[in-house]
Amino acid sequence: LLPDEEVDLSFETSGKIIEINFEEGSFVKKGQLLAKVNDRPLQAQLQRLVSQLKLAEDRVFRQNALLERDAVSKEAYEQVKTELATLNADIDLIESNIAQTELRAPFDGVIGLRQVSVGTYASPTTIVAKLTKISPLKVEFAVPERYANDVKTGAGLDFTLEGKLNTFHATVYARESKIDPVTHTLTIRALYPNTNSAVLPGRYASIK
């Protein structure tokens, strides 16, 4: 049994971790803020640029009024407009850099054990935790090549798990594009809804 999605979570930038906002083993939602590295220098830059932006907007307004009365050249007006556009671009860049200091869940799932603490210096290669989407689960199995054409996409199958008496139902959704030349088998995947998240990935299933 395989998770529907799984990823090692890490930051897009480097910095000292100042927040960890998740409990190990808990369910998290897509977009949820999980952790954050220090962004104070970036916030200071943003505040400075926002202050400059207000002044630049005032200059453009005044220059436009003067231009309408032919009291200033077109070139002077275009210069202040360019300065305003540059400031807006700089603000967009800083805001993008600030967003990279935030680690957010890329999808709904269960977050595993954390590998860092507040105060840890993290880089893009630092794994914070693993995020696993366990609903649905993928059931991966292989059939001998002589049966490759017998298992169709959309077909249902039943499987059992060791230690559980009940039978689970999954639906085939994908087939490998070719026969494995070594094992002479075709790998097939089916989806089990796992709506209550009662079954964990990593277990071996017996296909009926």
Report each predicted region and the residues it spans.
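Short, compositionally biased
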Residues: 46-57, 143-148, 172-179
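Alpha-helical coiled-coil segments
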Residues: 41-96, 114-117, 139, 183
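Surface-exposed patches in structured soluble domains
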Residues: 19-21, 27-33, 104-147, 152, ...
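Structural microfeature recognizing short secondary-structure transition sites
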Residues: 112-113, 161, 166-208
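Donor nucleotide-sugar binding loop of glycosyltransferases
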Residues: 5, 24, 118, 195
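Short beta-strand-turn/beta-hairpin segments enriched in glycine/proline and small hydrophobics
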Residues: 1-12, 89-106, 131, 139, ...
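Short, Lys/Arg- and Gly-enriched loop/turn segments at beta-strand edges
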Residues: 36-48, 135, 166-171
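Short, conserved catalytic or interaction motifs in soluble domains
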Residues: 11, 22, 39, 96, ...
